[in-house]
UniProtKB/Swiss-Prot annotation:
Intracellular or extracellular location(s): Secreted
Stated family: Belongs to the DEFL family.
GO biological process terms on file: defense response to fungus; killing of cells of another organism
Protein known as: Defensin-like protein 141
One Gene Ontology cellular component annotation held by this UniProt entry: extracellular region
Signal peptide segment: 1-24
Cystine pairings recorded for this chain: C31-C76, C40-C59, C45-C70, C49-C72
Keywords recorded for this protein, A-Z: Antimicrobial, Disulfide bond, Fungicide, Plant defense, Secreted, Signal
Amino acid sequence: MTKSIISAFFIILILGMMVNEIEGQQQQQRCEEALTEIDCGAGNCNALCLQKRKGLGRCVQRTPCDKLKCMCYYPCSS
């Protein structure tokens, strides 16, 4: 009986912490910037974005006719 109560307590505690983390991530605004100084390569794009804005770089193609572009997604506060 005691083990199940302790287990339930920890599960509720962990779920509460997860909800707080998710809410914090949703409140944080995301900005984006096209990094034109490099050709789009997955490693290059991500490395430059991380160095420049502490963000996540991805190669994207907005329309089928466009070339791949390096887009940097980062928290607006940085």
